[in-house]
Amino acid sequence: MEKIRIKTLTALLCACALSGCGRSVDVLIIGGGAGGTCAAIEAARNGARTCIVEETPWLGGMLTSAGVSAIDGNYRLRGGLFGEFTDSLAARYGGYDALRSGWVSNILFNPRTGADVLRNMADGAGVRCLTGTSAREFRKTRSGWSVTLTGGTRIRTRILVDGTELGDVAEAVGADELRDRISAQDLTYVAIVKDYGHPVAAAEPEGYDKDLYVNCCDNPMATNLDGKNPLGQKLWSPGMMLSYGRLPDGHIMLNWPVCANDYFAEYLDMTREQRGEMIRQAKLHTLGYLYFLQTELGFNSLGIADDVFPTEDGLPFYPYYREARRIAGCDTMTVEAARNPYDSDLYTRAIAVGDYPLDHHHMQNPRREELGHLWYGKIPSFSVPMGVLIPVATDNFLVADKAASVDWEMNGSTRLQPVVMGMGQAAGALAALSARSRRQPREVPASEVQAILLDHGCYLLPFLDLKPGDPGFRELQEKGVKGEVKGTGRSIDWTNETWVNLPENE
């Protein structure tokens, strides 16, 4: 009976939320991931009647709902909605310096705060947000799509956008898929913990095995091989391990890649039931890591934070997935294109930028030795072409998250939050243009989308010479995509960069 009441309430809420724009919209985004959320905000700001459907209560995906509230990369490339988001965080916490609370990132924040910022941005843009529900059926129509939601609500849309974490909508509508995946990256069930100031009752998780965690840091139980564990990872001190993901409010993000809570599973090949059990096991693995910290390393005052996620167990709504099904798009971004951007014309269609290395997580994979060449592969900063968002053969449809058409190796960089947000913003601009002009997305010239993105302070190319708002920024970006000026990229440790004019002291 209770389930029936919940379903009825969900249907009523959907109907009420849609009443302001009717059951027909210009742009419908399924999945409130980081990219999907940005797509919705951008589409609405460009005048499109926009609705986003998200199964959790929060927008933001990996940034918020999955608990990865430490941004990887693009610190010197803060433009567009990504820059607006980080500026809002800085304002909340008292400046950018306050966001440097942990050493994994220059920008850390409480996931709840991030979700609040994104929801405010979406509401301010006029996005209709249907949270706590999901799409159940997709039917192609002459002018777009008809989508049936949980509870039976139907929405008609001209442009449908996949903003899910795993590319579920792309699979459901039959979009062609790239088949180059060797193995899924490890996922992580993140936990946000806090110090309660007194011992916390710790229950041993089902299947707990402390040997899985003994090499997470330098401790008497670890196998220390000249400062490294048997997997070749540096053994940091326990204090450094915990300060890695310390948030500005003192909470700690447990997302530690050294024999901790990374978890391997081929989750893209699983049924819904299999994935549910996999998620349960990934949770137990993370709870085992926390139990190890509490009982073996003496951090007995740490416990799952009770003031972050509105979930029964206090954990995020779902895991941090580093891999999705990737469409076969009108463009495919490759590592070779990142390393040699002027060997093709992809740069002329640039719509988003990134500067993070090829960060592949495979340490928990039994096949890790054959995949070792992928870990932190060097590339310069790069741009992403518009065609990665557009499937080759599926009409009225775009992707806005990790389902973009990039090769499997390149996904190690494009999967990161700032790049996904940039791709999502571009997808929103393209969706709005396509809906308004009644053109297929593949018929819209990249230059039209680029003009909108430049209007909104986005980087098209990762030139560090000028930043948004500087005199000449727009002109430099426009000349860049026309090939009138070209940048020189380089990889310096974790600081990948591109300059039109290298600094004189270099």
Q: How should these model regions be labeled?
A:
Residues 36:
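N-terminal Rossmann-fold NAD(P) dinucleotide-binding loop
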Residues 139-154:
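Conserved beta-strand-loop-beta-strand element in the redox core of flavoprotein oxidoreductases
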Residues 42, 48-49, 54-137, 141, ...:
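Conserved N-terminal/central alpha/beta ligand/cofactor-binding core
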Residues 23-33:
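Beta1/beta-strand and adjacent pyrophosphate-binding region of the FAD-binding site
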Residues 21, 62, 115, 153-159, ...:
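Flavin (FAD/FMN)-binding glycine-rich loop and adjacent Rossmann-like elements that form
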Residues 1-10:
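Bacterial N-terminal signal peptides that target proteins for export
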Residues 465-476, 480-505:
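Extracytoplasmic Gram-positive cell-surface binding/anchoring modules and repeats
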Residues 13-24:
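Bacterial Sec-dependent signal peptides at the C-terminal "C-region" and cleavage site
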